[in-house]
């Protein structure tokens, strides 16, 4: 028989000896482990602007330059004349020219070991098949990267270093200089570090820490000589100043009077410059969007600015909302009412529908004319294939097959704007607190 113990022990001393009570650790090997069937994603794959551009049918081209004809200048010779036998003189004609472009090629590379594949290839082993997940999301990730590329000026710059700290062979970069922070780069991405002039390559490394909220990344290995002001450039670009990347919004929406645009000299061809409104680091105010749209009308005519969409970061949408809140009136009715001091998504800036993208420069609002934006394509987005194969084995150091596979999502494309004068932008806007 067992006697009730006066002590809280997992054992009991009786006349018949010492008896031990089994504890949970004695049966841990029998317990089942519960794994949630849900697989949340702790990051985003936003591709809002690229998806908007991709809606249009692509111009399928070869590796030869694509030509985009433009009626660049009016012509003819206007005059008064003497109808009583006077000489009408000679005349002229409108002037036509062309913009030229070539496609560039990009890839998203996914590599995994065979053990990775075999350990998850059955529902009895894992909640999902890792390889199926990789193939299902690779296209989304490539589109996300392409959306980031739409935010750079053709030089491949995806970040500007504001602070450098090195410890244990790892560089920590704060990216607080521009309006993007760490938004245009991704964890696991190989990036190159160039000096501020984009003339000197300091080195390259892999992003092993990615903190979007605090605009900070860590790069392994540490890059010798990296300093504040250096620029992060996408891997595969050797000469950023030659503009070898996708030509994004800042390239086409620019009123710069130096450099080139699709073969034109910006200094001698003002017709191909976009329309700029400089906010001079001030907060968004109501006259700025109206001025931007009126600049378009001044260039291309009052009836040619009706297809505009205002693209911006949600930070500037908030700034616009706060302007509206200052002039809002709440009419209280004699019944219980809910309170919502915020506006819905149907905002407009001077008549242009407002579209938000977290990948956008926080200091800019771009008035995009969908009628003049285009996309050239030599290779549609998809798997890189050879003889029908989409997945390729990795080779080991001996020359034999390594227990790892790789596949590539690829694309060959370029963007163009057929009439930059029909676009406008507001830049150097103050960013609301908290962003």
Positions of the model-derived regions?
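Core alpha/beta structural scaffold of self-assembling particle/tube/pore-forming proteins
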Residues: 2-79, 92-435
């Amino acid at each position: 028989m067992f006697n009730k113990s006066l002590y809280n022990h997992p054992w009991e001393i009786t006349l018949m000896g010492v008896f031990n009570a089994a504890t949970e650790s004695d049966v841990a090997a029998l317990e089942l482990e519960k794994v949630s069937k849900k697989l949340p994603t702790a990051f985003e794959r936003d591709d809002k602007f690229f998806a908007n551009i991709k809606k249009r049918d692509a111009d399928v081209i070869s590796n030869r330059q694509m030509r985009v004809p433009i009626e660049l200048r009016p012509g003819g010779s206007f005059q008064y004349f003497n109808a009583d036998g006077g000489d009408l003189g000679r005349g002229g004609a409108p002037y036509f020219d062309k913009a030229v472009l070539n496609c560039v090629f990009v890839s998203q590379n996914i590599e995994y070991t065979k053990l990775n594949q075999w350990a998850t290839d059955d529902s009895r082993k894992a909640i999902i098949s890792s390889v199926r997940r990789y193939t299902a999301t690779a296209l989304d990730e490539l589109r996300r990267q392409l959306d980031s590329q739409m935010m750079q000026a053709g030089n491949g710059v995806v970040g500007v270093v504001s602070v450098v700290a090195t410890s244990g062979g790892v560089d920590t970069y704060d990216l607080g200089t521009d309006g993007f922070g760490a938004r245009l780069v991704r964890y696991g991405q190989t990036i190159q570090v160039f000096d501020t002039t984009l003339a000197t390559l300091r080195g390259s490394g892999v992003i092993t820490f990615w903190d979007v909220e605090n605009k900070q990344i860590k790069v392994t290995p540490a890059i010798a000589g990296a300093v504040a002001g250096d620029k992060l450039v996408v891997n595969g670009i050797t000469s950023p100043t030659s503009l070898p990347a996708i030509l994004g919004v800042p390239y086409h929406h620019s009123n710069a009077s130096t450099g080139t645009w699709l073969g034109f000299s910006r200094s001698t061809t003002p017709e191909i410059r976009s329309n700029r409104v400089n906010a001079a680091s001030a907060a968004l105010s109501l006259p700025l969007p109206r001025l931007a749209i009126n600049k378009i009308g001044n260039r291309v005519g009052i009836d040619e600015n009706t297809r505009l969409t205002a693209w911006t970061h949600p930070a500037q949408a908030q700034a616009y909302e706060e302007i509206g809140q200052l002039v809002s009136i709440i009419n209280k009715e004699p019944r219980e009412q809910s309170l919502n001091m915020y506006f819905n998504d149907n905002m407009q800036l001077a008549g242009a529908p407002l579209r938000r993208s977290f990948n956008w420069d926080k200091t800019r609002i771009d008035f995009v004319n969908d009628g003049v934006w285009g996309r050239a394509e030599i290779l549609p987005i998809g798997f890189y294939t050879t003889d029908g194969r989409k997945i390729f084995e990795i080779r080991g150091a001996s020359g034999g097959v390594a227990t790892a596979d790789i596949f590539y999502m690829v694309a060959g494309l370029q963007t163009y704007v057929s009439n930059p004068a029909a676009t406008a932008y507001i830049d150097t806007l103050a960013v609301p607190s908290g962003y």
